[in-house]
């Protein structure tokens, strides 16, 4: 019985990997201008808004995954960090980026006007905290040492991360899904 359960889980993990890989390859192939826009990273209102919209469309374009995220390297102070943006990154209720409001605080945040009030948006709001193996993977990707696609399956959570390079800039696109009980179709 244990061998049957283990074998079923293994087949589910491999099938999900194949589905996510095919979906990711199609999304990248069908959306070159959107991928290029994501690769043109700068920490400002326009980028966050554009990235959230692109990632929301990608996550709704294919039922094989529930969420799309872009991970980019950046710095806060002198510390190298990773920032992650998703469809949930939308800055709802924001009217506009306040004029001359760049470089606010230690992390070069910016000021926006939300419902008539000024509000600071900081990089720390978008920090991505990878586990050790993810951090090692991201370090290799952003150092230009690998183009490896990273797949992870754990407790019914599936994620596939794909490095993308454009005009000397590197981003990592991650697509993820959750399957209750780890079964396809359950």
Please identify what each model-predicted range represents.
Residues 1-10:
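N-terminal alpha-helical membrane-insertion module
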Residues 9-21, 30-39, 44-47:
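Membrane-proximal amphipathic alpha-helices
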Residues 27-30, 61:
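Structured segments of extracytoplasmic/periplasmic soluble domains
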Residues 36-186:
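Extracytosolic and intramembrane catalytic regions of membrane-associated proteins
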